[in-house]
Amino acid sequence: MQDNALTIALSKGRIFEETLPLLAAAGIVPTEEPEKSRKLIIGTNHENIRLVIVRATDVPTYVRYGAADFGIAGKDVLIEHGGTGLYRPLDLEIAKCRMMVAVRKGFDYEAASQPGCRLKIATKYPEIAASHFAGKGVHVDIIKLYGSMELAPLVGLSDAIVDLVSTGNTLKANGLEAVEHIVDISSRLVVNKAALKTKYALLEPIIQAFGGAVKAK
């Protein structure tokens, strides 16, 4: 990447939409909407600033290895990734939700999650789930899934799930209920550590603008 150019890694969906006001605060406007375009590289109103559209779980990897100078990733993704090689200057307070344990209605979670007990947990977030239950002294068999998490307890694949919950409507519609809060999740600004040094003059005004926009909410 050129020293006078910046690449920003973003994912489609809620994070992208809630990032637009932050970009605007820094004077950055995308030339296209990723939901309407098949392009994975999108220009902006600045010739030297571009966006790359990647999977949410890949944002830290693109930033860590310098394919992007900075990006926006959920705390859940960063915990699973480990955050190696990343500078995390700001909680942007967007895409807020909660990481929760959920079970089918009628399941006695309190009794089943006592120290020394064993549970089968289905989740996209094995690191978060394993750490949480280890802290409780509960033995767990982690079943990694990539979607339709709510199905797992209903068909006997797992006793419980660990997943992101926003409104809880999906859980309710599938006969599940949230029974334990693990951690609050929001999205963070992540910056490549090398880029922070070599492109400081370009990055610092954007970081400051993002910070100002967050405080102004």
UniProtKB/Swiss-Prot annotation:
Q: How does it assemble?
A: Heteromultimer composed of HisG and HisZ subunits.
Q: Which gene does this sequence derive from? A: hisG
GO CC terms on record? cytoplasm
> Where is this protein localized, as stated in its record?
Cytoplasm
Kindly name one Pfam family recorded for this protein. HisG
* Any one biological process term the GO annotation gives: L-histidine biosynthetic process
Q: Which organism is it from?
A: Neisseria meningitidis serogroup B (strain ATCC BAA-335 / MC58)
Protein's UniProt name: ATP phosphoribosyltransferase
The catalysed reaction is: 1-(5-phospho-beta-D-ribosyl)-ATP + diphosphate = 5-phospho-alpha-D-ribose 1-diphosphate + ATP
As recorded in UniProt, its EC number(s) are 2.4.2.17
